[in-house]
Structures are given as structure tokens and as C-alpha cells.
Amino acid sequence: MRMLPTNQIWRYWSFETFLEDVSALGVRDVDLWLCNNHVNIDAHGAYNTDEVVRGMRRHGLRAMTLTPEQGNPKAYNVASEDGEIRRLTLCYYRQIVRLAAALGAERISLNSGWFPFDADRDRAWDAMVSMLGKICRAAAEEGLTVALETLVDKPYRLVTSLETLGAALLDVGESNLTVTIDTGTVARNGEDIDAYLSRFGSELGYVHLTNLSRDIFAHLAWGDQLGGLDPQDLLRRFACAGYAGDAALEMTKPSYFERPRDVLSRALTTLRGCEC
């Protein structure tokens, strides 16, 4: 399994520092989170594409995955019923597809969006399915896959379980739409990794290898003593299922923001100690 650090905990640092830190730790492949501090992109353009491409190449790095900013209160929402938000959302993802092509990325990592508590779930579901289909078709033009993850049920209430993830894949019906298993989210939702591996098999296109504490609503780093998941057991399960693809190391706990390089170094050391 290839581990892809993300720039999420570098959000208060420059993009150059992120590039320097991960390359110094021997990393070559990353999941690039599209925060505007690092990648200046919106529905109308990707304004620093050349700078991002040059920086990645200068440090010998590859962006294998692009992860948009998504979810409330972000501006773009794949489940919105509002016509103008839908137009801008699709334009945003078309810009991401162009950026992915410039970077030589393989996939876009998505979630199912959100809808207001006082809105109809079925209408939001239909809006989500329609938008995911459009995004998948745009991505297919550049040979990209789209990897869809589950979220926690509250407050998202759309794709939040094995069953709703399977329903989304079936309803969208695009061959380049694949499954992301987020280990921390699956555990937080009380589900079983093996059930996902058994259900989706060849449809598994990506992994978020995340740790968790049930008392902290964040993705914890491997090596954080508050984390409750066993990385060696998880890696064994994926290996037994034949998964040898990419795994993003998403870490979002705010206390990591001041020392992101140290947090990533500890996580990589922990995971390397679990390899067979």
C-alpha cells in the first residue's frame, strides 16, 4: 500500500514548506488538498497552476489525488438543489479536472455533500446523484477516477454507510466512480472494514487510512496515543483483501497544525513498523 500524506495540517504554513517537509521525509507521492492557501482554485479558474506544478516537480513530488474543499460551509456542494450553486459546483470540479491533468493525478476524492435539516432527503439524493454523474463524466475525459467516501451520519445523512455507498454507486452508474474506505469514519459509524472489503472488492479505488478517538471529532495521526485503531490489524485486513493501492494519511486534529512535519514523521514511522 502506498501512503499519501496530505497538506491538511500544513494549512497555516506555506505550500513551499509543505513540499520541503514531505520531501525531506522521503515522501514522493501525496494527496493534494485544495485549500486556497496552497492551491488558489475556484469555479472560475486555477490561478496558480504553474506555480503548483513547478513546486511539485522541483521537489520530486507527485500529486496522485486531488481532494477538493467540500462540505458545509464551503461554497460548493454536490447535493445542493439551488441552480446557481449547482452551476458553480460543476464549474469548480471542471477546474479541478484541468488541474489534475496538469499535475498528472490519477483521481479526485469526493464526498456526497450535505443538505439542510429542513429539506427533503430524496430530493437532495437525486441532486447528488446527478452532480456526481456530471463530475465523473468530466473526469473520464482526462482518464481520472472519482473516489467516493462515506461520512458520519450526523449532520450529513446521505452517503454515510456501506448500504448508502453501494446505492450511490448504483444510482450514478459511471464506471470511473469508485469507493473510498475511510477507516476512522467506518469505525466511528460502528461498521466493519471487512464488510466493506467483501462488498466492494474491485470497486475499491482508494483508502483514507485514518485513526480516531471517539472523544475527538477529528482524524488522528498514527502514533498519537489517543488513537484507538490498530494500524497493523488494518494493514493486514487490506492486504488479505488484495488491496495494494493508495492510502491517504488524513490528519485533522488542530493540535497538529503547529508541528506538522513532526506529526507526519511519527505517523510514517508507526506505519513502517507495521509492515510485514
Describe the role of every protein-language-model region.
Residues I9-R11, L34-N36, E69-N72, S112-P116, ...:
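Active-site-proximal loop/turn and secondary-structure-junction residues that shape catalytic pockets
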Residues M1-N7, Y12-G26, V53, R57, ...:
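Histidine-acidic metal/acid-base catalytic patches
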Residues D42-T49, D82-R86, D118-W125, L158, ...:
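Flexible, glycine- and charge-enriched loops at secondary-structure boundaries
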Residues L32, A63-P68, A105-S112, V146-E149, ...:
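Short beta-strand segments at enzyme active-site cores
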Residues W33-V39, N77-E81, E250-T252:
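Glycine-/proline-rich flexible loop or hinge segments
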Residues W33-G55, S112, P116:
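Glycine-rich, proline-tolerant flexible connector loops at the mouths of alpha/beta enzymes
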Residues R58, A75-T178, R188:
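Active-site acidic/histidine proton-transfer and metal-coordination neighborhood
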Residues V52-A75:
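Short hydrophobic interaction/assembly module
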